[in-house]
């Protein structure tokens, strides 16, 4: 079939965030799915890689990165978009793209920034819109909305507009945290993913170190009570009608589910999770309600805590561009729900066309 008879999917990946490498891995998975035997007669792909300095590579070099296993960022300066080009969105490289598939995890991607940029092209975008992406990325705003809607969450505090370069400020905050929350606590940057910048703190001195670590990533910080929980996850796809996947559980050998354990070979993924059917249905219901509350559509992964001692469900967070790596839960959840990776990626493209 001629390319002009297929839909051209524009993949954007890489980026300046600290989740750059995860984005590259996700893009490789999606690219392979789009050109698989299942989808080769429906789609063809243009790709645009953004390096860690914010420089865009053209389609030819970006496709090389997707097809090869190399990690270097050799750049031919004749094949890079000028960073401040006035006619950026009208460049010939973008012509012919029917649907965008952004796979930028973290800041400038998952926070809705890339969606805002691509909206000017007036082409459909796979995934959520600007508002839902921004709210899903920002843990403080997300939690305030969920509190208003009485969606269950662990107890938390948020820190904003504080100069944490001042040791006195950190000391005072550590005292307040211990007074208001039960130890241990988790200290998180408000806008970060893949557990980057997150620390578990059991003592006041550890809280001070954790505040500094989080503040180096984001000036807005969330502190949550650390309960003894199971980590459960649910996939969501759809627009007006949202559909929930099977529930999955991550079992890990480390003290908590940090960045290294998320991409470790030692994790055990259990799908469906060994939970009561009533709990499973409650999680699916909360996942759908929470996405609707934040105006999230297209696809998302919703993460939950299930307290071991009480079986209470707590919503943790929503990921509006979940990973598509070989170790990512989102495609595994949908595979267990009847959609293999090729079918899932095609489904997400079709959903974007219906908006």
UniProtKB/Swiss-Prot annotation:
Pfam families (alphabetical): Dala_Dala_lig_C (PF07478), Dala_Dala_lig_N (PF01820)
Cysteine pairs bridged by disulfides in the record: none
Keyword Methyltransferase tagged: no
UniProt-annotated binding residues for ATP: 178-233
Domain ATP-grasp: 143-350
Sequence positions that bind Mg(2+) 2: 317, 319
Main location: cytoplasm
NCBIfam families, sorted: D_ala_D_alaTIGR, PRK01966.1-4
Biological role stated in the UniProt entry: Cell wall formation.
Protein name: D-alanine--D-alanine ligase
UniProt source species: Prochlorococcus marinus subsp. pastoris (strain CCMP1986 / NIES-2087 / MED4)
